[in-house]
């Protein structure tokens, strides 16, 4: 009480008097107060800040030890309420003592002169702790969404890769379709079921040597339960067949090339015999005739590609031909150009052998003992065989002429 009274009456005098007047004043409370304020002024501002920060840190730690759940009660840390704003505290201290005398300074130290202590720091943003949050449902749902998002992205990426692989496979199948024309041709609305197929592994290995020669060939397979195609109904197993194009039929499916001089041959054996002329080293090993592999494609049954032909696969009673060579002869005779003409009667032929046989026998008549005449020897023989006794060939048909019978008559 006495201290406050003396301070209230003597404040202005004490603040303005010199040191000699202050020291000459002998009141014990005034001396104690002045000693405390002198001690504070002698301390550095940073030391005071450290002491105050340590004090309030200890107080916060004690409060945390008393109630450890207070920090995470709301899912976040309240930095603003539990932090010590030492700048505000220092400003209050200096503002309350700004009228005291400082022996080491000529001006009153104002807190505003320090740029670091001009204004209190803004409170930090409130953010949830990811590991100590008390809302596990929300935190559990978010990874689930991310999981679904990742699964969707992975599914999309997998689908895009699968689409890419499908496109690669489709392009590969397209190439194979262009080269080999896999699958049955379109049978229309009335067509029966069929399945696409490739050659067996054995046939594929046998024809691997002729891979380049067999490009562009069409390989198909149909089931034998096809009632509309009578030639296919031979059991419950599947048969391979081949539908060559007209260019393949006319020019041949194989062109074997010599690796040394690049001369081409229609037959593999002819090419091997040609290579013997290049040296004796080609008579042994894989280059010799011992290792010749037959062309598997040439042994397959073939359908004619000409529309309307009875050997066409679209024909209701279609039958495949024996092999490719038979198909070549059939196509030339029935659907090909006929460049050979008889010099006697002018009849045209597509096969050279048929033309030579016809020209040799052109204009001749074949007679029977009964008086019947025939243009073809085959017809006379059929006549004699049919009527038997009393019917014999006349004009002395020799064996050489019998062997030179026309192949056309045999096919017809």
From Swiss-Prot:
Subcellular location: Nucleus
Signal peptide: none
Domain of life: Eukaryota
Annotated region described as Disordered, given as residue ranges: 187-214
Protein name per its UniProtKB record: Zinc finger protein WIP4
GO function terms (MF aspect): DNA-binding transcription factor activity; zinc ion binding
Compositionally biased spans, kind Basic and acidic residues: 201-214
Gene that encodes the chain: WIP4
Function: Probable transcriptional regulator.
Motif (Nuclear localization signal): 332-335, 375-378
InterPro entries attached to this UniProt entry: C2CH-3rd_BIRD-IDD (IPR055187), WIP1/2/3/4/5/6 (IPR043584), Znf_C2H2_sf (IPR036236), Znf_C2H2_type (IPR013087)
């Amino acid at each position: 009480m006495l201290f406050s009274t003396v301070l209230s009456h003597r404040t202005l005098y004490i603040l303005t008097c010199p040191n000699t007047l202050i020291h000459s004043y002998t009141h014990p409370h005034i001396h104690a107060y002045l000693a405390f304020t002198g001690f504070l002024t002698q301390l550095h501002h940073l030391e005071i800040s450290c002491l105050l920060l340590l004090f309030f840190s200890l107080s916060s730690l004690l409060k945390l030890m008393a109630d450890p759940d207070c920090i995470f009660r709301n899912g976040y840390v309240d930095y603003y309420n539990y932090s010590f704003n030492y700048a505000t505290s220092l400003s209050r201290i200096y503002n309350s003592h700004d009228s005291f005398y400082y022996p080491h300074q000529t001006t009153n130290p104002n807190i505003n002169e320090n740029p670091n202590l001009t204004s209190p720091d803004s409170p930090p943003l409130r953010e949830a702790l990811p590991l100590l949050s008390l809302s596990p449902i929300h935190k559990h749902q978010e990874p689930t969404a991310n999981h679904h998002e990742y699964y969707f992205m992975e599914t999309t990426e997998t689908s895009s890769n699968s689409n890419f692989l499908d496109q690669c496979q489709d392009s590969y199948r397209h190439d194979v379709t262009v080269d080999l024309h896999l699958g049955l041709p379109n049978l229309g609305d009335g067509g029966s079921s069929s399945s696409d197929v490739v050659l067996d592994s054995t046939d594929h290995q046998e024809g691997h040597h002729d891979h380049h020669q067999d490009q562009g060939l069409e390989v198909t397979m149909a089931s034998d339960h096809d009632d509309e195609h009578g030639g296919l109904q031979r059991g419950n197993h599947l048969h391979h067949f081949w539908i060559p194009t007209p260019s393949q039929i006319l020019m041949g499916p194989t062109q074997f090339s010599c690796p040394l001089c690049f001369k081409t041959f229609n037959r593999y054996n002819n090419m091997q015999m040609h290579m013997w002329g290049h040296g004796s080293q080609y008579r042994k090993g894989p280059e010799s005739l011992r290792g010749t592999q037959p062309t598997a494609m040439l042994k397959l049954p073939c359908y004619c590609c000409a529309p309307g032909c009875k050997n066409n696969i679209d024909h209701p009673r279609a039958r495949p031909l024996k092999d490719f060579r038979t198909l070549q002869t059939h196509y030339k005779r029935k659907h090909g150009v006929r460049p050979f003409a008889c010099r006697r009667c002018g009849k045209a032929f597509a096969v050279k052998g048929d033309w030579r046989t016809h020209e040799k026998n052109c204009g001749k008549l074949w007679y029977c003992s009964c008086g019947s005449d025939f243009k073809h020897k085959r017809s006379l023989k059929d006549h004699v065989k049919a009527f038997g006794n009393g019917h014999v060939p006349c004009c002395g048909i020799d064996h050489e002429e019998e062997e030179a019978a026309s192949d056309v008559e045999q096919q017809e």
